[in-house]
Amino acid sequence: SEEWDKVRGEASPYGNAWDFRTNREGLLRYWGDALKERGRYENMITIGMRGERDSALLGEGSPVEDNVTLLKEIITAQRGLIRSLEQEGLVRENAPQMLAVYKEVEEYYYGNEKISGLYQWDGLDGVICMLSDDNFGHLRTLPTSRMREHKGGYGMYYHLDYHGSPVSYEWVESTPFSQVWEQMTEAWDY
């Protein structure tokens, strides 16, 4: 992220690597300082992690199982940090927490034949899971009947413009209002 680029470095108290395996303490310190600064305000706390520059967490081609295991470790540490700061009065009590199920982590959310994904994991109880569109204004998924049992509920991330590879469309009315209405009505009615 742009914010991480401003604070990272060899001499930084947060370290240089956006990698939980090699820079766990630095990232927890970074997230903790952000929570201490902003946690008493009315806001939603995002949890989870993607790779640098919105990439896959452990890189392209890495096994889903390894990514799911690491993401569970990250979320467990983040939720522990939030609870700890909440007890100290540095984070608003019961502030909502949200996991964004972007395309980079969607496979880890659902899992595969070798590992259950995050959506069946009780470590996300009480967390809002924000599903995402396909970057072009089309819903990727809606919660199944089993997913609807999730304690925390769901939200929807919807692009009206997009900045990213392979194409960017920004500040241009590129998603017709009729499509926005149709897609968001489908999500609402579901």
Model-predicted segments: where are they?
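Glycine- and acidic
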Residues: 12-16, 56-65, 161-173
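Intrinsically disordered, low-complexity regions enriched in small/polar residues
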Residues: 6, 16, 104, 110-112, ...
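Gly/Pro-rich turn-and-neighbor structural signature
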Residues: 24-151, 172
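Structured mid-domain segments that build the active-site/substrate or prosthetic-cofactor binding neighborhood
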Residues: 133-135, 144-190
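Catalytic domains of carbohydrate-active enzymes, especially glycoside hydrolases
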Residues: 1, 37-43, 183-189
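Short, charged, surface-exposed secondary-structure boundary motifs
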Residues: 6-10, 139-141, 165-167
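Hydrophobic or amphipathic alpha-helical targeting/insertion segments
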Residues: 1-38
